[in-house]
Swiss-Prot record:
Its EC number is 2.3.1.234. It is an enzyme of class 2 (transferase). Keywords: Acyltransferase, Cytoplasm, Iron, Metal-binding, Transferase, tRNA processing. Required for the formation of a threonylcarbamoyl group on adenosine at position 37 (t(6)A37) in tRNAs that read codons beginning with adenine. Is involved in the transfer of the threonylcarbamoyl moiety of threonylcarbamoyl-AMP (TC-AMP) to the N6 group of A37, together with TsaE and TsaB. TsaD likely plays a direct catalytic role in this reaction. It is found in: Cytoplasm. The gene is tsaD. Transmembrane segments: none annotated. This is tRNA N6-adenosine threonylcarbamoyltransferase. Binds 1 Fe(2+) ion per subunit.
Amino acid sequence: MADAVILGIESSCDETAAAVIRNGAEILSSVVFSQIYTHMRYGGVVPELASREHLKAIVPVVRQAVEDAGQSYDKIDAIAVTRGPGLAGALLVGVSYAKALSFALDKPLIGVNHLEGHIHVVLLEQKQQGVGEIQFPVLALVVSGGHTHLYLAEKKDAGWTYRDVGHTRDDAAGEAYDKVAKLLGLGYPGGPILDGLAKHGDPRAVRFPFAQIKHRDRNPQNRHEDDDARVDFSYSGIKTAVLRYVETHEMKAAIEARRTALKEIEKPSQDDYLRVCDRQTLDLIASFQRAVVNDLVSKALHAAAENNAATLLVTGGVAANSELRETFERRAGELGLPVYFPSRPLSTDNAAMIAAAAYPRFLSGEFAAPDLSAEANLRLR
């Protein structure tokens, strides 16, 4: 068949992104407009502000992606857009624009689950690198600021299927990073800040135990025969433990001084963050990261074994974390379990992943109706 060129659009949180891919295997362009510095002063993403920024950015971002791909709009075969999950207002901007573009160009529209996109971007890069087909079933850990999920993914004749075999009961892992960074006066986004600082601390200085969570659904109709193979997460407890450590070790004055010092710097560098952190803070950060990483790795490997997974994918914004990657590679390697990550630029939100996830649907003719809507709490199944 002729080449299939898909334009992807992503606007689920604080990145406005567009990308063009060919045949689900070649990235022709990928443009991301980040709002990090817009939200940094507030210590986190402000939903209404995010929506406004998407409105400003979406037209030029899409135009740039098409130009960078060396394509014209009439050469686009389909338009894919994130329909959820995410921030309702932010999603609406992307969905509305994609629908308008689909109508104006008379091109089919494909609605994509954001979480499925994170899974497919790993497969996309494997194809780009000429790596052979991965083995199924696949266990995918999707871990980011808003999500911590384990999915058993299989590729069947009727398409891809996903079974939720574990998720967070409260905070996502990336959310815990953001909250701890804010608590320590380091600001937003917490993930890359803490990852950089953790290298300078002692990860054995503070002990953070995790409770083992057993899945129990009170509704018998929702119970699955494989419930005993589930692995769930919880990260609100470690955030509270960090707060207690701060209070009992009289760190609040130093934190306020750090917060004040960083406010004077418009775009702090990693060296700036390191300069305002004392040994006690660095040890606390390193211990926090070691605890979260060990919890994610141990539970993902346990779920892989319980569900007879042949391959492990680790994806999402937190997958860019250096210690997480190193620990997964070492421990999965010891078990002989292949583990794959997206490249760091494609770990965070982007539109190449949306176009990649749309490609199988394009081949099977699964197109969205003209009344496609955004769904903030969309589930992957």
